[in-house]
Each structure stands twice: as structure tokens, then as C-alpha cells.
Amino acid sequence: MASYTMKLSTYIEMWSQYETGLSMAEKIEKGRPKLFDFQYPIFDESYRKVFETHFIRNFYMREIGFETEGLFKFNLETWLIINMPYFNKLFESELIKYDPLENTRLNTTGNKKNDTERNDNRDTTGSMKADGKSNTKTSDKTNATGSSKEDGKTTGSVTDDNFNRKIDSDQPDSRLNLTTNDGQGTLEYASAIEENNTNNKRNTTGTNNVTSSAESESTGSGTSDTVTTDNANTTTNDKLNSQINNVEDYIESKIGKSGTQSYASLVQDYRAALLRIEKRIFDEMQELFMLVY
């Protein structure tokens, strides 16, 4: 029970006093945002909740050093704004100092030079012979067939008209009035008359059919043989002189864990370094609380 002011736990539990069955951690989480309802600098935003929870647990049963909780919160905010930039640098230096999962970091810089000279002399002799033979045979056969057909038809008509009159004239007893054959005059007398009148008409029809055909065949063949022989001899000489200058600059880095220390041990050492900084902060924040126990 507080003797002079109020305990920090009283302020924290005030925000969950009507809720039953809560654990201590749940009560602290309910009251934490109410206590730290202001902004202050922190090296890593994800570490803010961890830091605030550790602060409450460290001073949970301590009496605040001011008459009211409002005055306490004002001085708490002021202290964090003024002092946390310094402690943030300490936190950051621990992060920069090393990776918690590494205990070895080795950088090696080197220079290597390699000169190589090479002389090659190569003689190459070769020969080549090629024989070739070819046989060509040709055969040609040509068949030609042709035919022609001519059909003709002739039609004609012939008409003959003949008129003959023979007249013997003595002293006529009486006059006649006969028309001449050409119709241009008349005959007045005749002792005897003989007439022939002939009409002939002929129709002629002729048909001419001519068919002709022709067929020819020709056959030819030929054979040719060719024999070729090629001989070739080659001689080559290759000379190669080479000089290689190789300069190598290298940087070798080895980073990781070596030795028998486990990763769990490395992480534990890293957390211990952060807790040591927190302990320094909480030691200096004693001035915000009553120095009675």
C-alpha cells in the first residue's frame, strides 16, 4: 500500500479494474498505451512496445515521485524527450557493432601475377587421292500419230428451155397472125409450120468424204563412261608464339559463425547488450519515483 503518493501499478490496473480474469501481462498491456500516450524518440519503432513494457515491470511496485499522475506523466515525457536521443545512439552502436548471428568477419585482399610464354611449331603433311567413275546411259523413244478427216457436199440445179419453129411459106391463101418466139413481132402467112418446145430441169447432189491418218515411231539410245583420278599433296607449317601476362587482384570476405558457440548463445549475448543499456536508463529514471521501498 502506498505511503505517500500512488504506486505505478495502481495507475496501470485502473484501466482494467472492471475486467476479471486478466493476467498480469494483460493488465500491463491494457494500461501501457494510457501511460505512454505521447511521442518520444526511439531508435527502432518495433522496440517501443518492448521498452515501455520493461519500464512498467521495472517500476511496477514503486510510488511515483509527484503529487498527481498528470504531473508524473508530464515529467516522464520530458525525461524521455531529453535523454532518449543519447541512449538511442548507444542502442544503434550495438546494432552497428556486430550481427548477433555472426562471430567471424574476415576480409583478405591479395594480388597475384602470372606470366606465361608459349612457343608452338607444327608441321603438317597430308595427301589425298580421289578416284571417280561415272556411267551414263540414255534411251529415247518417240511415237507420233496423226489423223485428218474432210467431209464435203455439193448441190446443183440446171434448167434448159428450147423452142424451135420451122415455117414454109408459099403464097398464102389467107393471112396468119402468129407471134414470134421472141415476142417482138407477128407472122402473117406460112404454108407449113413445125414447132419444138423443150423444157429440161436437173438437180445434182454430190458428197465427198476424205479420211487420212499417219503414224511414226523413232527410238534412240546412248551410253557414256567417264573415269576421273585426282591426286593432291599438302604440306603446312604453323608457328605460334604467345605470351600471357595475367594480373589478378582479389578480395576475399568470410562472414559467419565459427567455433563452438551456438546461435542461441549469440542471440542471448545480443539481448544482454540491449538490456544493459535499458538498465542504465532505468537507473537514471529513479528520480521520477519516491526513493522509499
From Swiss-Prot:
<comment type="similarity">
    <text>Belongs to the phi29likevirus proximal tail tube connector protein family.</text>
</comment>
<feature type="compositionally biased region" description="Basic and acidic residues">
    <location>
        <begin position="130"/>
        <end position="140"/>
    </location>
</feature>
<feature type="region of interest" description="Disordered">
    <location>
        <begin position="104"/>
        <end position="240"/>
    </location>
</feature>
<dbReference type="GO" id="GO:0098026">
    <property type="term" value="C:virus tail, tube"/>
</dbReference>
<comment type="function">
    <text>Forms the proximal part of the tail tube.</text>
</comment>
<keyword id="KW-1228">Viral tail tube protein</keyword>
<keyword id="KW-0946">Virion</keyword>
<feature type="compositionally biased region" description="Polar residues">
    <location>
        <begin position="174"/>
        <end position="184"/>
    </location>
</feature>
<feature type="compositionally biased region" description="Low complexity">
    <location>
        <begin position="196"/>
        <end position="238"/>
    </location>
</feature>
<protein>
    <recommendedName>
        <fullName>Proximal tail tube connector protein</fullName>
    </recommendedName>
</protein>
<keyword id="KW-0426">Late protein</keyword>
<keyword id="KW-1244">Viral short tail ejection system</keyword>
<feature type="compositionally biased region" description="Basic and acidic residues">
    <location>
        <begin position="162"/>
        <end position="173"/>
    </location>
</feature>
<dbReference type="GO" id="GO:0099002">
    <property type="term" value="P:symbiont genome ejection through host cell envelope, short tail mechanism"/>
</dbReference>
<keyword id="KW-1171">Viral genome ejection through host cell envelope</keyword>
<keyword id="KW-1227">Viral tail protein</keyword>
<keyword id="KW-1162">Viral penetration into host cytoplasm</keyword>
<keyword id="KW-1160">Virus entry into host cell</keyword>
<feature type="compositionally biased region" description="Basic and acidic residues">
    <location>
        <begin position="112"/>
        <end position="123"/>
    </location>
</feature>
